[in-house]
């Protein structure tokens, strides 16, 4: 067997990972971004290069011989941040769990250890791969050793072997040492020869081979280069010595100690779970063949022949695990290829399309609990057949979302199976591939498809009791069974129903936008004095800051920043700014909503069938995609015009019901602030009331400006805004914003107490809860980084309020949906956006629909203040506002 060693520069990779990735923390508040980046890279390297041996070298704090010879060596380096320092020991512990060899030796750097170990391995017939972010290691490249230099943080590597170094740099790997001796290295504070850069250095090395060769032939060098070299000969020789990686460090190990693979998978999984690396869990199965990883489900798969017997068995158990596989097609008439069914998760049956109606009883029976993975898809798959999947009881994706709402990558069955069962289930990408070459489920051969589905069904049955126990312990079992699971059916029907779009009006709007864009382009070119690509930040930056001479607010790596924040600060500097802002807004409206909507109108019914997502946001809010209806801009009139294209069908009207200030009402209830509760109970305008409290005037004396400012304060408090954030919103001094907030908390003192208690609870528990016990974990609240800690505090203040508002709208949706069904109405709930529900009501049913919607929304939960609903009717979404 060929022996392959991967040796990693631990300090280099963890440093690069730390600065490449945003801050991450586990539930205990431990920083994990550097560990995550390192581990992700490690798994990728193992998967790519399949090493038989691995070692990781680390620096030690003790000074090296380089520090002794040159006191200024690495003197300019910044002190290591505490957030990075605290990740070293957990990383080393993880490496130990992988049974990966580690080396660190006093007096020597990781580079020297790598140089020595790689030489020993080469001499023993190994193929060697060195992984580092430091180009110094290129000097170690040879016919037996490839140096992998990380790029794009630690996401990719560039390979350097002996031939590729010569091809790219026209010098041998060892001549890299001479080059560094000449040009120095700022990061290590190696001086080199002042005035000699890379270009001149390469030219000299190519001509004279080495620093020694240069000085042996110094008289053949002319001009200032000769002078620089003569004046700095000792510096050049010393710099070369400092840059030379030592390859005879007194290491004590034998190569057998570096063998990779003899590890306990459960130990690694336990550490991954502790660190919160749920997205990495499935990748352990790719590496491991030990008994710890279950690679095959112990199941039987067969075609269902005796349907009556199976129906009786399902009725006896009152549970059915279901997974449908559909052919590609339109949501309204998509055909089912197979349905896989099981009672116990071990004996799995499949049927084809011709048997669907024979099983209708078990699908539609409310007595039989339906269990599965992404049950919304299964519900929608049966809709074209006129079959309604009743009693959607347990979906492992939704259960896992409640258990860990912070991990947006962990809800795939592969991650769930590995996390709870140490079982390998292929990811969607592993099964189907990725990109343009990705297959569809319908294209898989039956053996591969059925094997994968059986793994999913086995996982559903096996993890359900574990998840149920977790949810019970955290008091979220009620949230699952009474809110999230009943909501699946509601969202599925909303997707299937869709919303009617006026295509003619949409095209008309597109024409208007194009005319405005053309006009704005002309005006921008006139002010700037030339034509240029307005959509290019680089070209726009040159126009604004060089040609027009506007003050530079911020720079990026590629030039001037022209983002929205920068443009906002330049508004008073030139008339071109307002036109650029408007241009960008209209271009986005046209591309996202006009062109975007036109491309997804269903040809069968002329409606748009948005996907409603239940497991995306950390707060519990529902989101939507294709299109994202939550983001349709309403502050601009042109943005509001987009709502004109969403219309009611013939013989119908849109009934729009919007909660009035639901988050402030939740705040009043949760804080038990008497002043705010009293204001809502007496139907006082809460923003006017707040203005009178903050500005110490009677409610009759409140001006429109004061009310507007008070509104910003009210919602600023809900979102945990700082005095600085409020000052930016209101365009007032920070001191004044601070006074507003202080006055607010003086008048609403229970709210201040409530917010303080929430922060304290979040700091001690690591999470906050909503009125229905939904948890939002906030690890950043324990960060030693001031800005992140403050962001955590803001999230802690907002999450219970916004999350409770999400709980309320979900309950309202379920109740409205049920009432429409119970009354046998043809009217349908079709949209949910923020705190707003839209029902497409048949003309003859409008009165009863209005009553149902208002009653169910206002009585969704019992609070100490009323839930008020604003209700409007119109032919389009725009008309209801």
Language model segments and positions:
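Function-dense linear segments that define catalytic or interfacial modules
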Residues: 340-345, 405, 411-428, 433-434, ...
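Catalytic palm active-site di-aspartate
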Residues: 395, 487-496, 659, 723, ...
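Conserved catalytic core of nucleic-acid polymerases
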Residues: 439-442, 496, 602, 609, ...
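Conserved RNase H-like, two-metal-ion catalytic cores of nucleic-acid enzymes
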Residues: 5-6, 10, 16-55, 71-72, ...
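Extended two-metal-dependent nuclease catalytic cores across DNA- and RNA-processing enzymes
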Residues: 2, 22-25, 75-248
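Conserved "right-hand" nucleotidyltransferase catalytic core of DNA-directed polymerases
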Residues: 232-353, 436-632, 653, 663, ...
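Charged catalytic and DNA/RNA-contacting regions of genome-maintenance
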Residues: 129-131, 137-174, 317-318, 335, ...
């Amino acid at each position: 067997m060929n022996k392959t060693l991967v040796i990693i520069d631990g300090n280099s990779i963890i440093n690069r990972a730390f600065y490449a990735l945003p801050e991450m923390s586990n539930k205990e508040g431990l920083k994990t971004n550097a560990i995550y980046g390192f581990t992700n890279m490690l798994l990728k390297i193992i998967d790519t290069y399949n090493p038989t041996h691995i070692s990781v070298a680390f620096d030690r704090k003790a000074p090296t011989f380089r520090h002794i010879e040159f006191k200024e060596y690495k003197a300019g380096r910044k002190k290591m941040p505490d957030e990075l320092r605290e990740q070293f020991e957990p990383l080393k512990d993880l490496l130990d769990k992988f049974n990966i060899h580690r080396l660190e030796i006093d007096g020597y750097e990781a580079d020297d250890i790598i140089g020595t170990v790689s030489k020993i391995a080469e001499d023993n017939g190994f193929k060697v791969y060195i992984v580092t972010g430091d180009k110094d290691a290129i000097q170690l490249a040879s016919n037996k050793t490839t140096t992998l230099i990380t790029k794009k943080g630690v996401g990719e590597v560039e390979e350097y072997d002996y031939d590729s170094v010569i091809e790219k740099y026209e010098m041998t790997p060892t001549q890299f040492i001479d080059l560094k001796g000449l040009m120095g290295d700022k990061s290590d504070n190696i001086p080199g020869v002042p005035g000699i850069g890379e270009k001149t250095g390469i030219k000299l090395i190519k001509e004279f081979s080495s620093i020694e060769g240069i000085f042996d032939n110094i008289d053949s060098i002319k001009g200032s280069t000769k002078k620089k070299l003569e004046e700095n000969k000792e510096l050049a020789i010393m710099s070369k010595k400092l840059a030379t990686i030592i390859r005879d460090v007194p290491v004590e190990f034998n190569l057998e100690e570096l063998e990779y693979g003899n590890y306990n998978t459960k130990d690694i999984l336990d550490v991954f779970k502790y660190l919160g690396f749920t997205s990495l869990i499935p990748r352990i199965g790719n590496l491991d063949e030990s008994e710890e990883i279950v690679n095959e489900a112990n199941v039987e798969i067969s075609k269902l022949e005796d349907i009556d017997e199976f129906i009786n068995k399902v009725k006896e158990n009152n549970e059915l695990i279901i997974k449908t596989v559909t052919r590609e097609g339109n949501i309204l008439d998509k055909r089912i290829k197979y349905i896989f069914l099981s009672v116990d998760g071990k004996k799995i049956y499949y049927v084809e399309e011709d048997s669907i109606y024979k099983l209708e009883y078990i699908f539609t029976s409310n007595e039989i609990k339906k269990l599965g993975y992404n049950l919304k898809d299964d519900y929608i798959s049966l809709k074209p057949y006129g079959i309604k999947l009743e009693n959607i009881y347990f979906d492992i994706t939704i259960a896992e979302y409640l258990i860990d709402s912070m991990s947006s990558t962990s809800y795939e069955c592969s991650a769930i199976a590995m996390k709870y069962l140490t079982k390998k289930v292929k990811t969607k990408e592993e099964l189907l591939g990725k990109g343009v070459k990705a297959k569809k489920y319908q294209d898989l051969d039956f053996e591969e498809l059925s094997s994968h589905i059986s793994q999913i069904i086995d996982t559903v049955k096996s993890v359900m009791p574990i998840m149920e126990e977790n949810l019970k312990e955290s008091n979220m079992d009620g949230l699952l069974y009474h809110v999230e699971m009943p909501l699946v059916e509601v969202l599925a029907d909303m997707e299937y129903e869709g919303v009617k779009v006026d295509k003619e009006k949409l095209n008309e709007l597109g024409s208007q936008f194009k005319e405005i864009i053309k006009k704005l382009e002309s005006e921008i070119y006139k002010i700037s004095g030339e034509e240029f690509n307005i959509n290019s930040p680089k070209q726009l930056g040159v126009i604004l800051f060089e040609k027009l001479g506007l003050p530079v607010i911020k720079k990026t790596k590629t030039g001037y920043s022209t983002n929205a924040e920068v443009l906002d600060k330049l508004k008073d500097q030139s008339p071109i700014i307002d036109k650029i802002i408007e241009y960008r807004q209209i271009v986005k409206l046209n591309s996202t909503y006009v062109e975007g909507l036109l491309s997804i109108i269903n040809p069968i019914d002329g409606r748009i069938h948005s996907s409603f997502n239940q497991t995306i946001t950390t707060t519990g809010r529902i989101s939507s995609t294709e299109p994202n209806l939550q983001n349709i801009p309403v502050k601009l009139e042109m943005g509001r015009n987009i709502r004109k294209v969403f219309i009611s069908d013939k013989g119908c009207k849109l009934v729009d019901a919007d909660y009035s200030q639901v988050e402030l009402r939740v705040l009043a209830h949760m804080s038990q602030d008497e002043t705010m509760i009293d204001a809502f109970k007496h139907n006082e305008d809460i923003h006017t009331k707040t203005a009178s409290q903050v500005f110490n005037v009677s409610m009759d004396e409140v001006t429109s400006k004061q009310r507007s400012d008070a509104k910003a304060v009210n919602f600023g408090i809900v979102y945990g805004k700082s005095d600085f954030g409020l000052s930016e919103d209101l365009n007032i001094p920070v001191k004044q914003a601070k006074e507003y907030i202080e006055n607010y908390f003086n008048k609403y003192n229970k709210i201040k107490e409530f917010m303080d208690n929430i922060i304290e609870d979040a700091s001690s528990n690591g999470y906050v809860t909503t009125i229905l016990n939904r948890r939002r974990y906030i690890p950043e609240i324990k960060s030693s980084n001031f800005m992140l800690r403050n962001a955590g505090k803001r999230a802690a203040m907002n999450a219970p309020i916004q999350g409770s508002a999400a709980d309320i709208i979900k309950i309202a949706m379920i109740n409205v949906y049920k009432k429409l069904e119970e009354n046998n109405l043809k009217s349908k709930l079709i949209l949910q956006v923020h705190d707003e529900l839209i029902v497409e009501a048949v003309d003859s049913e409008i009165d009863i629909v209005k009553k149902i919607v208002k009653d169910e929304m206002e009585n969704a939960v019992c609070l100490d203040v009323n839930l008020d609903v604003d209700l409007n009717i119109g032919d389009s979404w725009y008309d209801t506002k």
